[in-house]
Amino acid sequence: MLPTFAYESRLKAMMVEVSEICKEKGLRVFFADAQSVNGIQTSIVHVTAHGEAKKEQLLASRSAKAGEEIVLVKWIGMEGTLRIIREEGAALAERFAPGFLNKLEDMRDEIFSDRAMEIAGRNGVSAMHPIGEGGILAALWDMAEGAGIGLSVEMKKMTVRQETIEVCEVFHLNPYQLTSTGAVLMVTPKGEELKERLKREGIPAEIIGHTTEGNERIIWGGGEKRFLDRPAPDELARIYEMKENVNA
């Protein structure tokens, strides 16, 4: 869905970008439809994907077990940061040097985690959970809820790029609740082994905590203990709310 003021060239550019990414990743686009919709200020894209895998290759988040380590692969908030740059590039250009924003744009191709998932499938990972809308805090909750387990994690071990922190500070956003597609939580009894294997491939990975019996979901930060809350709305929603208020 596109705003009524969007040009046809915008739709064509979106389809070219989708086609290029699919070609690079060995995917096919079977069908695409588009329409102009009143009342929206930005393009909305819905994707339905279909794939096949052997049963033993499926590593659903509900397969996580208590007593295993939680490994965070890649950086939290990266996708959200790139989307903020696209939405608020002009505002950010007033605060940051061009080299800063160009460096972030160069990271766009690095958010994909397909290689990391291949490695995980061969290294004893019992469960995986992608970090999407709502950020890592939502992903941790959803993973624990789906598996019926608890967890204990440390915020200081969660990998986040300094650029993401600085962009979030401009708009007073929480990077831990920012959409993070491309980052993945992996649960394994051999966390250190998996981390080192991924790092040898140049893939950022850190052990951020472990799963536990029961339902307590604990986050440690600054020496303080707190309990993980139910997922809050993604911080990107605040960006769109700000844009709507400006345009109102």
Q: Which residue ranges define each predicted feature?
A:
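Glycine-rich anion-binding loops of enzyme active sites
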Residues: 1-85, 210
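Active-site-proximal betaalpha loop/short-helix elements
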Residues: 3-6, 105-179
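Solvent-exposed alpha-helices and their adjacent loops that cap or buttress functional pockets
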Residues: 22, 37-42, 61-65, 118-122, ...
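General beta-strand structural signal in soluble alpha/beta enzymes
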Residues: 28-33, 49, 72-73, 127-131, ...
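Active-site glycine-rich loop that binds ribose-phosphate moieties when present
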Residues: 46-60, 95-119
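Short, compositionally biased
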Residues: 82-101
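Helix N-cap motif at beta-to-alpha junctions
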Residues: 187-193
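Acidic, Ser/Thr/Pro-rich beta/coil linker or hinge segments at domain junctions
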Residues: 201-248
